[in-house]
Amino acid sequence: MFDWLFKKNKNDEYVSCEWLEYGVNFGAIGIHHCCQFSHSDKNDKPVSSLNSKNQYCVREFFKQKNIVRKQHKKGKINERCIGCFDLKKQVWEDKNKITRMAIGPNTKCNASCIYCYTSYKKDFYNNKKDIPILYILKNFVENNLIDKECEITFNNGEPLIMDEFEDIVNLFVDNNVGKLRVHSSGIKYSTAVRRALESGRCDFIVSPDSGNKELYKKIKRIDAFDKVVENIKEYAKIQPTQSNVQLKYIIIPTVNDTFEALKEFIDIAKECGVYRILLDIELWWYRKNSKNNTKIRKIFELAKQAKYYMEERGIILLPSIIFDEASSSHKDIYDEVMMN
C-alpha cells in the first residue's frame, strides 16, 4: 500500500541510523522518527498527529521519513541528529518496514522514583490523559508495515497502567508481530504480559533498585516491595528461557551504592527465579559527575564485585544504557578495573 514511498535508489553508503531508516517512536506529544533526545539541543518535534484516526496519519509519517532519508543520502545530516551516537555510515536497504518501535504516549506511573523527571511534577504527569494509539498501531499491523522481528520497547511512565496497554500487547501477540521489551515498576500484574511471555516474544524488565522494603520505599516512595516480589515470581515461573524476565538495579550514589545493598538485591533476584540483572547508573548523577574519574572508578569497582557475586549464583550481569555510556567514555578505567 505504501510501496510508492520507497522507490529503490542506488545502494551507496551514507550516514544514517536504524531509527531514521526504520524506526518510529510514539511519544507523549506525537510521532517521532526516534526516541533519542540527548544528542542535540534541537527539540524533536512530532512529524504527525497522534489524534488522527485514519490511514493518512501513517501515510504522512512515511512521507516525512522518506524526506529525511533522501536528505541523508545527499550527505545533509538532519540538524536534530548531529552528535548522535547511533549515526553510522553504511549501505541502508530501502524497505517499507518498521524494525524499531518505542511506545510511550503516557506519563502516568504508580511509583514516584526519586530519580525520575516526573517526580518533580507528579500531579501534572499523573493527571495527563493517555494519547490513544491503538488505532494507528492496528493500521501498521494491517498494512504489514511492522517487521516480524521488530524491537518494540514500552517505556515512559508505567506502561501497564496505560488505558490501551493490554489491547496493544494482545494485538502484537495475536499477529505474531515484534519482539516486545516492557519496562515496568512491577506493581501491577498484567495478563497481557503473561501471554506475551508465554509466546516467547517478550522480555519483561522490572527495576526495584533495592533488595529490602525500607530501601525500596525510600527510592520508590511507595510501600509495594512485597507485591513487586510476588509479581516477579509469577512472571519468572512462566518465562520460556532464563533471559525473559530481568531485574534492573540503578545505582544511585549515597542511596543504594553499597555492595551490601546490591547483594540483597541479587539474593532477591535468585529467590524470584530471575537470572538476568541489568545494572545502570542514575542519569542525572552521571551527567553531573561524568568527568570525575575517581567517582566513576568507584562505580566500576562496585559493578565488578556485583558481577562476581552474580556469577557464583548463576546470574548474568547485563550493562544498561547509562552504564554502557560510562564504560565506553571511560574505557581505560573500565578495562583496568574489570579486567584485573
List where the protein language model places each region.
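Leucine-rich repeat
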Residues: 133-140, 165-167
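Conserved C-terminal portion of the radical SAM core fold
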Residues: 149-153, 178-181, 202-208, 226-330, ...
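Active-site core of PLP-dependent enzymes with the aminotransferase class I/II
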Residues: 161-166, 292-293
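Core AdoMet radical
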Residues: 98-108, 117-134, 147-162, 173-189, ...
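Glycine-rich helix-loop-beta junction characteristic of Rossmann-like nucleotide cofactor-binding loops
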Residues: 142-146
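Distinct, well-ordered alpha-helical segments
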Residues: 164-170, 190-198, 257-262
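N-terminal pre-core extensions flanking Radical SAM catalytic domains
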Residues: 1-126, 295-340
